[in-house]
Amino acid sequence: MSDYELDPLPYEYDALEPHISEQVLTWHHDTHHQGYVNGWNAAEETLAENREAGEFGSSAGALRNVTHNGSGHILHDLFWQNMSPEGGDEPEGALAERIAEDFGSYEAWKGEFEAAAGAAGGWALLVYDSFSNQLRNVVVDKHDQGALWGSHPILALDVWEHSYYHDYGPARGDFVSAFFEVVDWDEPAARYEQAVELFE
């Protein structure tokens, strides 16, 4: 059985200020993200024990917890990696070209992504859809509701209230704008290249 662990942030807790405060990053990473790691491990342990005992009364709940907490852990890892204090630029190279091809322009992609972020009850994601071989924005509620089967996440924005309420109150749009001041396209570009290698 895998034992999942919380990796350190790839920068200091105050590195994204003034856009995302040290307090929010500390709470978000050390408490919320850690909770998803703990929940995933606990669910896997329950499943392993049930298989060993041949008793499956609690397995359905544990399976749901694997999906919820596992997706939460994976998306948070991606979220931390696609921000940096050196961020704030637009994508370049192959990913920029593909965004323009699939959405018409970077501005059209960004407008649609911001709309997704405003509507989501969890995450706005830019994904590579391996079924149709194109980039898409998707609205994900919680961590696992609304995801598109066969899609490969490229860019993730967490819009759960714990991501922004301390800094921005109910003004989620201000937080989304702040995200674009720290978004670092190096990791999304690498994930896009990985998707192309896998699926095209």
Curated annotation (Swiss-Prot):
Mn(2+) binds at H29, H76, D158, H162. It catalyses: 2 superoxide + 2 H(+) = H2O2 + O2. Binds 1 Mn(2+) ion per subunit. It holds the Pfam family Sod_Fe_C. It is an enzyme of class 1 (oxidoreductase). The keyword Manganese applies. Its cofactor is Mn(2+). The keyword Disulfide bond does not apply. It comes from the Archaea. Its EC number is 1.15.1.1. Belongs to the iron/manganese superoxide dismutase family. Destroys superoxide anion radicals which are normally produced within the cells and which are toxic to biological systems. This is Superoxide dismutase [Mn] 1. It comes from Haloferax volcanii (strain ATCC 29605 / DSM 3757 / JCM 8879 / NBRC 14742 / NCIMB 2012 / VKM B-1768 / DS2).
